[in-house]
């Protein structure tokens, strides 16, 4: 490996490491991370193919609350490096990348519970002094260990994979293991599908999963066509089963609003009578918007998104509070514990910006009201953001991109990158602007509309997931049942042929629901993956699987 490739590999793996911390641009997803590695090493096609296969395995790997999955960034970079430099087939590369990703999960937990906590406490000292530049610097300082956490292991694997005796050792792995792992790579994807189904968990909508499955099994529908089918079914479900419920929304809204605490209602009244002496404008809100592009970089295990949130709100606080003392109080107020889904956090930021504006104009809003609104919103928004964005939109777009990329088509990762970032930017912008304009009224609006949106999008997700089970899960049982002669030719009938005669793709469907059952019984996804890898090796060794 040349010095140029070494430097490029360091840069792209660092980008993926920072992406794993922020989860903004999705550069940490295997489909993107492997493509970047392929670009750095001069073999884009192999990188795209490795990333597509790894992405389908890792579809269900998502960060929810304090729960950290195996590191998808490391999985993607290692899979591509072993495929390109180590000259291994993709199945072997994925099988090695998965345990490395589990080790990366441990590294991330250590980083976020030690290094990033220390840096966050340094930010506390800057908040005490009213030093916004210091807080900003601490937020971005956490990006260094995040970058190195992925870059260093990736470079080590690249170095050793390039050494001749390591390649000889990899090539001497017994064929039953290498071929068995290759066989297992065909059905490891069911773990990701099952994880997403567990997150969605709306049983009355499961029939749409079977619609997608059957449509793909008995037709030549493409992934784009599958998405259109899912979107059409979602539209039908909304207009015929959900939209009519909106008639009752107006009747119940007052009742729902009454359920909010009295402080929130009082805040709303205060916000409607804003003093024009200090007024936030679109330029101020756009500063918050641009800061959100690296929102979750400084997430830590002690106070989670506190530094992220404070860093994002700094432009608003600097404009509203002119003295160091007032600014320091505001900064410390937003350095308290906070955590929600990063794509829905603009809603909280917008409401808080409106409240801080009212407070700066001497209206009757205290620290407890501002903090109380944050606490009241963060749970429901996380509960909606995780399934909608991580459980539906990201895996759906990633699966479509991966499906296009399996043959080495770079359009796959590009399409995924563009679509997911358009969704992200729309949510960031309008979530912030609308919530600022509505103030505390936003709470009622969210409670009314988000559950309906979730059910509608879940119809789309189930349809696509069902189709993916049929399209990308490969299980072949070549065991011979019997033979007979027809027109002088010997015809052999296998178990797979008999199963296909009953219903094609029966085994992929059964495997998916079996893993879904195990996950609901609290079996860790990593153990499911390891179990399927062992099944692939044993099945191939005894001639049961091919």
Regions inferred by a protein language model and the residue ranges of each:
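Membrane-interface helix termini and inter-helical loops of multi-pass transporters
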Residues: 162-176, 474-496
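Helix-coil boundary and interhelical linker segments in multi-pass alpha-helical membrane proteins
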Residues: 1-7, 37-48, 82-97, 402-414, ...
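Helix-loop-helix junctions within the multi-pass membrane cores of secondary transporters/permeases
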Residues: 94-189, 319, 325-466
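Soluble N-terminal domains of membrane-associated systems
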Residues: 247-367
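Loop-to-transmembrane alpha-helix initiation sites
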Residues: 93-95, 219-232
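Juxtamembrane boundary at the C-terminal end of a transmembrane helix
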Residues: 230-235, 536-546
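Generic transmembrane alpha-helix motif of multi-pass integral membrane proteins
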Residues: 31-42, 83, 210-216, 513-519, ...
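Hydrophobic transmembrane alpha-helices
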Residues: 1-74
């Amino acid at each position: 490996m040349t010095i140029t490739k070494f430097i490029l590999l360091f840069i792209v793996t660092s980008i993926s490491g920072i992406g794993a911390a922020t989860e903004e641009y999705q550069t940490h997803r295997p489909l993107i991370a492997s493509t970047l590695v392929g670009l750095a090493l001069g073999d884009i096609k192999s990188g795209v193919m490795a990333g597509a296969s790894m992405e389908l395995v890792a579809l269900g790997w998502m960060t929810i609350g304090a729960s950290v999955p195996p590191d998808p960034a490391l999985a993607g970079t290692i899979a591509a490096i072993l495929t390109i430099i180590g000259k291994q087939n993709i199945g072997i590369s994925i099988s090695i990348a998965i345990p490395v990703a589990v080790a990366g999960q441990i590294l991330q937990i250590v980083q976020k519970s030690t290094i990033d906590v220390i840096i966050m406490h340094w930010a506390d000292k800057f908040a005490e002094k009213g030093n916004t530049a210091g807080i900003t610097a601490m937020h971005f300082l956490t990006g260094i260990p995040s970058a190195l956490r992925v870059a260093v292991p990736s470079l080590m694997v690249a170095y050793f994979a390039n050494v001749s005796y390591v390649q000889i050792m990899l090539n001497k792995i017994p064929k039953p293991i290498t071929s068995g792992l290759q066989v297992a790579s065909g059905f490891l994807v069911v773990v990701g599908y099952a994880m997403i189904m567990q997150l969605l968990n709306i049983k009355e909508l499961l029939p749409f999963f079977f619609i997608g499955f059957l449509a793909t099994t008995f037709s030549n529908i493409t992934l784009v066509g599958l998405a259109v089918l899912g979107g059409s079914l979602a539209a039908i479900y909304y207009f015929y089963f959900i939209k009519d419920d909106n008639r009752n929304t107006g009747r119940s809204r007052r009742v729902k609003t009454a359920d909010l605490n009295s402080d929130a209602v009082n805040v709303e009244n205060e916000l409607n009578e804003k003093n024009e002496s200090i007024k936030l404008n679109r330029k101020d809100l756009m500063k918050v918007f641009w800061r959100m592009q690296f929102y979750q970089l400084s997430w830590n295990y002690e106070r989670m998104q506190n530094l992220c949130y404070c860093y994002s709100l700094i432009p608003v606080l600097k404009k509203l509070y002119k003295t160091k003392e007032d600014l320091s109080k505001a900064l410390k107020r937003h350095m308290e514990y906070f955590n929600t889904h990063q794509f829905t956090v603009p809603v909280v930021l917008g409401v808080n910006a409106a409240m801080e504006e009212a407070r700066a104009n001497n209206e009757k809003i205290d620290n407890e009201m501002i903090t109380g609104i944050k606490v009241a919103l963060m749970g429901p928004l996380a509960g909606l953001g995780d399934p909608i964005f991580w459980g539906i939109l990201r895996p759906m777009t990633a699966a479509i991109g991966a499906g296009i990329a399996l043959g080495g088509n770079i359009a796959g990762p590009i399409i995924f990158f563009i679509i997911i970032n358009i969704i992200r930017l729309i949510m960031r912008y309008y979530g912030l602007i609308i919530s600022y304009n509505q103030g505390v009224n936003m709470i009622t609006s969210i409670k009314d509309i988000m559950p309906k949106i979730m059910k509608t999008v879940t119809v789309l997700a189930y349809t696509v997931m069902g189709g993916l089970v049929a399209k990308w899960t490969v299980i072949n049982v070549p065991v011979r049942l019997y033979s007979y002669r027809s027109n002088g030719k010997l015809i052999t009938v296998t178990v797979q042929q008999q199963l296909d005669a009953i219903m094609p793709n029966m085994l992929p469907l059964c495997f998916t629901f079996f893993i879904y059952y195990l996950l609901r019984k609290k079996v860790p996804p990593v153990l499911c993956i390891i179990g399927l890898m062992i099944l692939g090796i044993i099945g191939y060794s005894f001639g049961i699987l091919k």
